[in-house]
């Protein structure tokens, strides 16, 4: 693919927010589909967008090119589960040309980890160097309760495979009342032992999945007291 708009007059017009801060980070959801059904995220019978309503990868590439021309330096790909969308690796490989041009610093990705066993080497080869993995528990039964999928062993193996394939890993853990709140210290210890960064995240106390999310909410103030 050719460079798009990188050498046009628009190149120097950086994006500025209402507080005068330069915007250099873009997050793109490549799909709303996911192979998990986390209780704080979506119901079991989730109705997804028609595929024709999603941007094609060519359209996403053009969109990214426009943002890069306005000063975006970092792009994060997310979903849904981004690795579930066919053609993602080719999209990343094409987008990585901007890294080689010096116009983009990095492309990162957020995943639930379920497809890392098969795809982590492809991710590395396509230009990805860092990934975030959503992991809320290290206990098999709890994992099923949270994700509605019996896939913990595969996810853990996938994370380790990704590490062995050269990817830097950050664990994202959503803290959930009566689910993993009393396990947080163990998760942090496991992450640090394996040289993973970790972020603890509040579940948003709004909206409905199968239940009001306020029932699952734990403030980070309470988490700090726990650890």
What are these regions (language model features)?
Residues 2-107:
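Conserved alpha-helical substructure of the radical SAM core
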Residues 165-166, 218-227:
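C-terminal accessory region of radical SAM enzymes
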Residues 28, 93, 185, 221, ...:
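Active-site phosphate/pyrophosphate- and oxyanion-stabilizing loops and adjacent acidic/basic residues
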Residues 54-57, 149, 214-217, 221:
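Short, conserved loop/turn and helix-capping segments at secondary-structure boundaries
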Residues 57-77, 84-201:
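Radical SAM/AdoMet-radical enzyme domain recognition
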Residues 46-50, 139-146, 207-211:
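A short acidic, helix-capping loop that chelates divalent metal ions and anchors anionic groups
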Residues 178-179, 199-220:
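Flexible glycine/acidic-rich beta-alpha junction loops that bind and position SAM and/or redox cofactors
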Residues 31, 43-44, 134-136, 201-203:
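Generic beta-structure capping elements
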């Amino acid at each position: 693919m050719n460079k798009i708009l990188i050498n046009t007059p628009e190149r120097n017009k950086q994006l500025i927010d209402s507080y005068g801060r330069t915007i250099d980070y873009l997050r793109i959801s490549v799909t709303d589909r996911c192979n998990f059904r986390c209780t704080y995220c979506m119901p079991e019978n989730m109705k997804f967008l028609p595929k024709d309503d999603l941007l094609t990868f060519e359209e996403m590439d053009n969109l990214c090119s426009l943002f890069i021309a306005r000063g975006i330096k970092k792009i994060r790909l997310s979903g849904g589960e981004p690795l579930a969308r066919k053609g993602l690796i080719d999209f990343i490989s094409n987008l990585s040309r901007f890294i080689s041009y010096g116009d983009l610093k990095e492309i990162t990705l957020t995943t639930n980890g379920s497809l890392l066993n098969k795809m982590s080497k492809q991710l590395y080869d396509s230009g990805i160097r860092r990934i975030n993995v959503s992991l809320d528990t290290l206990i098999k039964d709890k994992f099923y309760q949270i994700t509605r999928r019996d896939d913990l062993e595969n996810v853990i193996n996938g994370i380790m495979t990704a590490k062995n394939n050269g990817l830097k890993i950050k664990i994202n853990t959503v803290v959930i009342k009566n689910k993993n709140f009393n396990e947080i210290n163990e998760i942090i210890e496991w992450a640090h032992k394996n040289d993973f960064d970790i972020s603890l995240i509040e579940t948003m106390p709004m909206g409905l999945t199968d239940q009001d999310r306020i029932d699952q909410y734990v403030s980070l103030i309470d988490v700090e007291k726990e650890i």
